């Protein structure tokens, strides 16, 4: 198994870029890849200093990592603890109070281990669908786990940015770890800062990256997040790693060409609408699904839009319908 990877970042509408992201293969093992994404916390002084300190601590440790030695979880924990110490030391040296969040993914043949602290997230997409994500170290995540708010309310909750752990503080950081075992071809992990994930539901992310090469997927998500921020967006950063079957001799040209073929905006809109309707099911949704599958133009798809929006509102409520309408309008405008 081999891994493709890509990353991107954007300053958003802030004066300073306080996110950092690095994705790299191991210097002695091309099939071992590390992604590290860190977000310097804007509520403290020295956010950019904190984020850069994380990178400065983690990258040399990865370069010294021996893939065959030790448990990956232990290595990732050690990397985050080293980053924590470096952030704290940087604060003392510059008389500041830097803090940062961090998420790491370590891909080795057949598995991907991850670790995180704070609200920078890792998502897993499998078979073109959202499978799981890390749980934020935040008050809002606790409310979600207690059933007091919904997943859709997390992104816009007024307390969303309140974390109970981070790197660089007086207390040792809380670190969560996990492993995606028996990776399948096309399994994709996506790392994102809150400046990016706040603008998307996980199901929409799956639609946007499922049939794209990784660089195009990163660019598309950042572009849409910037559009939705309407001039008041945070720093954004994203990294992706995708598992691929080894390329056989003679198939390289075909595979390379196929990865360059991007779906049209019309196909994006069709797939987005179909995914929503299949999720709610029922006679009305099933009939709309057949109609949308038969659409061959933007005009035909637009004609089915009002009925689809009504069906989504009937099953998912006003909040889901509002999101559905906004996203479909964006896609149809592009088509």
Predicted regions and their residues:
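PP2C/PPM-type serine/threonine phosphatase catalytic domain
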Residues: 1-268, 272-275
């Amino acid at each position: 198994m081999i891994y493709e990877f890509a990353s991107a970042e954007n300053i958003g509408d802030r004066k300073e870029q306080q996110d950092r992201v690095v994705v790299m293969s191991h210097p002695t093992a091309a099939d071992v890849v590390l992604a590290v994404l860190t977000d310097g916390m804007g509520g403290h002084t020295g956010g950019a200093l904190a984020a850069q300190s994380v990178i400065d601590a983690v990258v040399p440790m990865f370069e010294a990592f021996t893939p065959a030695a030790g448990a990956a979880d232990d290595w990732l924990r050690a990397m985050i603890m080293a980053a924590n110490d470096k952030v704290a030391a940087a604060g003392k040296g510059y008389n500041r109070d830097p803090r940062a969040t961090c998420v790491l993914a370590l891909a080795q043949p057949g598995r991907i281990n991850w670790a995180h602290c704070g609200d920078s997230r890792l998502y897993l997409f499998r078979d073109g669908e959202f499978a799981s994500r890390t749980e934020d170290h935040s008050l809002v995540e606790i409310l979600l786990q207690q059933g007091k708010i919904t997943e859709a309310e997390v992104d816009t909750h007024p307390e969303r940015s309140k974390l109970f752990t981070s790197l660089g503080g007086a207390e040792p950081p809380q670190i969560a770890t996990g492993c995606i075992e028996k990776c399948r071809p096309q399994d994709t992990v996506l790392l994102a800062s809150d400046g990016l994930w706040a603008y998307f539901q996980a199901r929409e992310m799956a639609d946007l990256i499922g049939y794209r090469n990784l660089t195009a997927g990163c660019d598309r998500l950042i572009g849409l997040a910037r559009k939705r921020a309407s001039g008041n967006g945070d720093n954004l950063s994203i990294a992706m790693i995708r598992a691929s079957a080894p390329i056989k001799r003679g198939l390289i040209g075909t595979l390379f060409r196929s990865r360059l073929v991007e779906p049209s905006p019309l196909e994006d809109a069709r797939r987005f609408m179909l995914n929503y309707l299949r999720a709610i099911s029922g006679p009305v949704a099933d009939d709309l699904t057949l109609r949308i599958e038969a659409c061959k133009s933007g005009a035909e798809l637009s004609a089915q839009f009002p009925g689809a929006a009504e069906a989504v509102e009937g099953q998912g409520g006003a909040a889901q319908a509002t999101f559905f309408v906004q996203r479909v309008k964006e896609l149809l405008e592009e088509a």
